[in-house]
Amino acid sequence: MRALIQRVSEASVTVEGECLGEIGPGLLILVCAMQGDGEAQASALAARIAKLRIFKDEAGKMNRSVRDTGGAALVVSQFTLAADTSRGNRPGFSAAAPPADGERLYRQFAAEIAACGIPTATGRFGADMKVRLLNDGPVTIWMES
C-alpha cells in the first residue's frame, strides 16, 4: 500500500456538498492499495503511521506521534497514488488494486488506524471528493508497505 501523509491543523472531506469527515490537528492520510496488497500490508502501514513521530515536542523537535498529541486522522482513498508517469503525458493506473480489493483494504486500513486509539474520519471510496486541509509545517511524507 502507498500513503501520502500530511500533518494538518485541520482537514475535511466533502462529497456532493455533504461533509463526511473533518478533523482538527492531526494527519490527513491519502491511501492507495496496490496490485498484490493484502491485509498484512494494510496492517503494517497503519501501525507505522500510528507511531510516526512528526509532531513537535517541547524542544521543538519532531518527536511525537499523532497518538502522543491526541490528534486525529482523516483517511481518504486515492487510487491516483498508483500513477505511472514513465511514458507519455497521461498517467496509467494499472498498478492500483482492483476496486473491490482497494475498497476492502482501504476500510481495513482506516479501522486499523482507529484501533490504534486515533480518532478517525474517512471519505467515501470511489467518490469524487473535495478535500480541504490546512498544512502544518508543511510536513508531507510518502510511505509504502
From Swiss-Prot:
Its EC number is 3.1.1.96. It is an enzyme of class 3 (hydrolase). It is found in: Cytoplasm. The keyword Protein transport does not apply. Keywords: Cytoplasm, Hydrolase, RNA-binding, tRNA-binding. GO terms for molecular function: D-tyrosyl-tRNA(Tyr) deacylase activity; Gly-tRNA(Ala) deacylase activity; Ser(Gly)-tRNA(Ala) hydrolase activity; tRNA binding. GO terms for biological process: D-amino acid catabolic process. One of its GO terms (cellular component) is cytoplasm. A motif (Gly-cisPro motif, important for rejection of L-amino acids) lies at residues 137-138. It catalyses: glycyl-tRNA(Ala) + H2O = tRNA(Ala) + glycine + H(+); a D-aminoacyl-tRNA + H2O = a tRNA + a D-alpha-amino acid + H(+). The keyword Ribonucleoprotein does not apply. HAMAP family: Deacylase_Dtd. Belongs to the DTD family. A Gly-cisPro motif from one monomer fits into the active site of the other monomer to allow specific chiral rejection of L-amino acids. Homodimer. An aminoacyl-tRNA editing enzyme that deacylates mischarged D-aminoacyl-tRNAs. Also deacylates mischarged glycyl-tRNA(Ala), protecting cells against glycine mischarging by AlaRS. Acts via tRNA-based rather than protein-based catalysis; rejects L-amino acids rather than detecting D-amino acids in the active site. By recycling D-aminoacyl-tRNA to D-amino acids and free tRNA molecules, this enzyme counteracts the toxicity associated with the formation of D-aminoacyl-tRNA entities in vivo and helps enforce protein L-homochirality. PANTHER family: D-AMINOACYL-TRNA DEACYLASE 1 (PTHR10472:SF5), D-TYROSYL-TRNA TYR DEACYLASE (PTHR10472). This is D-aminoacyl-tRNA deacylase.
